[in-house]
Amino acid sequence: MSTYGTLLKVTSFGESHGKAIGCVIDGFLPNVEINFDLIQRQLNRRRPNQSKLTSNRNEPDKLIVLSGFDENKTLGTPITFLINNEDVIKKNYSSFIDIPRPGHGDYTYFKKYNVKNKSGSSRFSGRETATRVAAGACIEQWLHTFYNCTIVCYVHSVGNIKLPEQVSKDFERNPPSRDLVDAHGAVKYHQGRGTFTDFFGNVYNANGEFLRGGEAAPEGATPADGTPTDGNPTDDPLANARERLSDPGECTLLQTRCPHPLTAVKICSYILKLKKAGDSIGGVATCIAHNVPVGIGEPIFEKMEAELGKIILSIPAVKGIEFGSGFDGTYMLGSDHNDLFGTLDVPEEGPCQRGWTLTDALDSKRGEVTPGGSRAQEGTSFEKDACHRSGHLSNLSGYPSNGSGNPPNGSDHPSNRSGNPPNRSDPRVDESTRETSPPSGEKLLVTTSNNCGGILAGITTGNNIVFRSAIKPVSSIQIEKETCNFFGEKCKLKVTGMHDCCILPRLPPIIEASTSIVIGDMILRQVAKYGHSKLPSVGSLSRSTRE
């Protein structure tokens, strides 16, 4: 089927080499202000032909709004988005129309529909994911405005190149913003010299080996990890890097979406070598949903993990998903794996909503959190205090310069010209009746660790939802292989056309959008049963405490 959701339904349509692709969102709330520029920015993060690391199919992926809005405000009627296909070269596929491509759905598609796929991968192409990015980027603006919920995905590994273990743990506790993911994941490539330059200006050779520190590298930057290890530079490293990387001159800007500069350089080197050889590679992407309301998820067959798994596994090339400790948890004892409960005490003045996790609230009692919500830990890949402050990055990846890399809230909303809070008077979602605190005498419990990945018994705990997706190597490779045609005859095949060597750099906005769709539907299902009084969240409690 092409529809996901129970109350909030998203339907996608169109084929990879058809005239257009699109989606319909049904069941979305009325009177929600949507900034179409934010949707377009997420589409831009996903689109092909971004750099030498991605497919050279030149699709601008410009969003076309067909229905569901009065200017920028939803009507409560079906929302329809359309994206034209503009770079279709069908002749690239004519030479192997009778040969099912290994790793693709050509054979199974034929057996199911009795139709040979003459061009591209039709409905089974990764091209379809542009439609869910449009839908999810719309839905997540509502999630952020009403629940302060933010979602970020980044590349954890490509092949055997992965984030350092401590850096990965720190990111799962304090998620980086999308701005930071794109800033630290950007690498300048000087093809003539065969050198790479990372976020901090450090220079590496074609194999990703450190050569020298750059003039713009902040004090404390070391080739060991490619990141600053001490001090608080007076200059803004994010703004400086943006200025350097936005005007590469004779260099090419590569985007990995791996928020660790040294790892990003190694990924670039590896992918370019594989692309030259005509091969492909997969990897792992990590997604973190922050400030998800407590208590959403439906037993037994529609648990939060099950629903997330369903939509994430529907993304082409995704072959697996794990939550929290995942498969590593099988090596742990129950005494180590169990997440113990504690109470949440939100300080009157302290970390802002973004960059503040449940374990941070507990750790603040022991003085382990700095005033800006950052956590100084050895091996972290960035200064969290600086990177999560507003105004530190104009916008490399998505959301306007509120500095969070997430949809704006309140008077910062770009569609709100008056500076007043967005309209929340919709009778179907009455925020004035919403109880943001537990009943008298009860405490909002949180877990001091997060091996469960923010979900227990299929229901959200309020901790960060953390999951990782396993991505297989791209099936279309330019290495000749012996296979069989539809008639059982041996033949040789070398796939031509416009394909990615590795889809990981384009994957984060797809996973972010898919996660938004699931959370949005689950929230509406909970509200339909119990109302907003049963939707406490850490973000709302933080606001009510300060107010």
UniProtKB/Swiss-Prot annotation:
Transmembrane segments: none annotated. GO terms for molecular function: chorismate synthase activity; FMN binding. It catalyses: 5-O-(1-carboxyvinyl)-3-phosphoshikimate = chorismate + phosphate; FMNH2 + NADP(+) = FMN + NADPH + 2 H(+). GO terms for biological process: amino acid biosynthetic process; aromatic amino acid family biosynthetic process; chorismate biosynthetic process. It comes from the Eukaryota. Pathway: Metabolic intermediate biosynthesis; chorismate biosynthesis; chorismate from D-erythrose 4-phosphate and phosphoenolpyruvate: step 7/7. Signal peptide: none annotated. One of its GO terms (cellular component) is cytosol. Pfam families: Chorismate_synt. Its EC number is 1.5.1.38, 4.2.3.5. It is found in: Cytoplasm, Cytosol. The keyword Amino-acid biosynthesis applies. The active site is at residues 17, 104, 500. InterPro entries: Chorismate_synth (IPR000453), Chorismate_synth_AroC_sf (IPR035904). Keywords: Amino-acid biosynthesis, Aromatic amino acid biosynthesis, Cytoplasm, Lyase, Oxidoreductase. Belongs to the chorismate synthase family. Bifunctional chorismate synthase and flavin reductase. Catalyzes the conversion of 5-enolpyruvylshikimate 3-phosphate (EPSP) to form chorismate. Acts also as a flavin reductase (FR) able to generate reduced flavin mononucleotide in the presence of NADPH. PANTHER family: CHORISMATE SYNTHASE. This is Chorismate synthase. It comes from Plasmodium vivax (strain Salvador I). The gene is CS.
